[in-house]
Every structure is written in structure tokens, then in C-alpha cells.
Amino acid sequence: SLKTSIKTITYLSDTGCLEIQGASLVGQQYSTGWFGDNAGGENYMQFSDMYVTTKGFLPFAPEADFWVGKHGAPKIEIQMLDWKTQRTDAAAGVGLENWKVGPGKIDIALVREDVDDYDRSLQNKQQINTNTIDLRYKDIPLWDKATLMVSGRYVTANESASEKDNQDNNGYYDWKDTWMFGTSLTQKFDKGGFNEFSFLVANNSIASNFGRYAGASPFTTFNGRYYGDHTGGTAVRLTSQGEAYIGDHFIVANAIVYSFGNDIYSYETDAHSDFESIRAVVRPAYIWDQYNQTGVELGYFTQQNKDANSNKFNESGYKTTLFHTFKVNTSMLTSRPEIRFYATYIKALENELDGFTFEDNKDDQFAVGAQAEIWW
């Protein structure tokens, strides 16, 4: 998809400003709105944010960013796994960021988003409105170069009588409120680099997404579809990610995630499932200079689900990647843009959850390519 960005700043006083930030026109209902009407999707563009943010307008929080529009609380990503530990989809709402309270800062967002609630055939759907509160108390100093964040998120639905009737009488899945709470500690190092440790616990549909073997961001839906018999089951996630410099010419990045859940709805093994998973990636590299690095990335994952009948299903695999990157700075995780040339071997050891195979029914693949990563 194509994303464009606009930003207009108007200073209204010596201490206050107003900014309009976003990505062109967006809808107010779904978080992933499309612009265009080509049924084949070729002329579609997808947009995320469109909001107005102000600073200096609130007497009780003059330093805070006060926003209104289609936006959400900042996302926190496990970069080498390409999914999030903290994510609330952009939606119509209001929020504050970087509000100084005591030793730390508060981020708070109140947003509404429509989701598609499906029936048990997964063929029919109804649109229901959800409301989310996302609250974080961050940048709490602990010791030298260490900070703490405490976070909470709660999602509830504002359902009409007809929507509830469809759930009671026409086979649509019941909406169940869902929450996620946690904490994270970030330690920065004297020579540069950092490590972030986090603990998260969630229930119902967010817990179901903890249990996904891929794309395990804390969503409330599965690819935009809400379904499943959620029974209050919970899941826990422990993560570590960061990077460290070793001497003048070496850097190592890491990402480790351990998750487990009990009595959750699994999108692979259905209701009353338990799961346990481990994902680990390490990426050492040699720093030639500020603009060049050569390294290897080693990754492994394993997951076991147990369904309501105690049947066990296993998914596991590994990959090895050799790469050379052109960069703007030496940090692996915080410097962009970068261009990477790579050769990757990936092997599926077990695939009882998804049954995936590569071309010609193979369980492995070798690929050579180039990619660019850009943030804006």
C-alpha cells in the first residue's frame, strides 16, 4: 500500500502550537480504512492516521500533546519478529501523550473502532462498535539509565439490541470484553544500545492473539474478524529485546519471547485450548564503518497447543540469514533508513497448526533478495 504524509504547523502563541498530522483522507469506522473504489484493489490506498495535536493548550498539562482525530497510543514493536507488544489500532478518539505526572509521564487514549462480528459459519457478519481505553505510565526512573512503564488496556463493545439478538438467536459470536495489563523495564548501556524486558497478561480475544504462532500482536480480532467462544481464559507473555556493542566493531541484537495460555480460544485449535511457545532471534554483525555492516541472523521458534480433548499440536522451525546492510548509523534497531542484501534458509520442522508447505510441497526454502526499511 502507498502511504503519504502531511504535516501543517500553526503557532498560536509563544507557548502553544497546533499541528495537523496524518496520511490524507481516512474513514472513521474501521482502523484500516481504504481510499478508492476499485474492486480488484489495484487503485486502493490504505491510511492509518489523521488527527490534530496541540501543545500548551491544557493548563494542567502544558507540556503534553493533546490530540483529537483518528490516532492511537504509540506502538511498541519487537522489530526482529515484526509484531508489537503494545498496539491499539488507530481509531477515532482523543488522547494525551507525555503528560508529566510525578516522576514519569502519562499516555492515555480513548478511541472507538468498528469491528466485524461473524457468525459460526464465518460467512455472515455484523458491524459492532468497540470502545478502548489505553493507559500508560512511562519513563519512571529506577536507577542509572533505567526506566519503567506500567500499562493497561480495556476494550468493551457498545452493542445495539439487534446485534445482541443476532448473538443470542442467530448464531453470531458473543462479544466478550477483553483487557491487557503489563509492565516493561528499559535499560540503556554506557556504550550505546539498550535492552527492554516486558511482562504482559491478557484475557479473551487479546489472549487469543498471544497464542498465534505468527503475527502475535495484541489485537482484539483475527485479521479484522471477531469470532470465537471466549471463556475468560488468560495468557502471559515475557519478552526481551535489545542490542549491545561489543568492542568497536561488533554489535549483537536479540529478541526472545516466551508465552503461555490456559483455557483460551485458539484460532487453530478452538475453545478451551492451552498453549506454550518460545521464539528466539540473535543477530550479530561486524561494523565496517558507520554505513556498512555484515552479519548473520539465527532464529528459532516452537509452539505446542493442547485442545479441549488434550490432543497436542506442534509447530516449530528455524531460519538462518546472511546479510550486508547499507546504513546511516551503526544501531541495528534504532537507525533507519537501511538497505539490506540477504540470503536466507528457512526450515519448517513441524507444522501441525497450519499445515503450511513451500512450493512443490517442500518443508524448506532458500531465498536471496534485497529490501529497504524506511521510517517516517
Give the positions of each predicted feature.
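Glutamine-centered polar micro-motif within alpha-helical contexts
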Residues: 1-27
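Residues that flank catalytic or metal-binding motifs in active/ligand-binding sites
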Residues: 46-48, 64, 90-92, 129-133, ...
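Leucine-rich solenoid repeat modules
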Residues: 316-339, 343-353, 357-360
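Outer-membrane beta-barrel pore domains and translocons
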Residues: 28-31, 69-73, 111-115, 153-157, ...
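Detector for outer-membrane/organellar transmembrane beta-barrel domains
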Residues: 135-159, 164-307, 316-322, 326, ...
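Outer membrane beta-barrel
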Residues: 21-118, 130-147, 151, 343-348
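Extracellular loop and loop/strand-boundary signature of outer-membrane beta-barrel proteins
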Residues: 35-38, 78-83, 116-124, 160-172, ...
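Outer-membrane beta-barrel "beta-signal"
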Residues: 322, 362-376
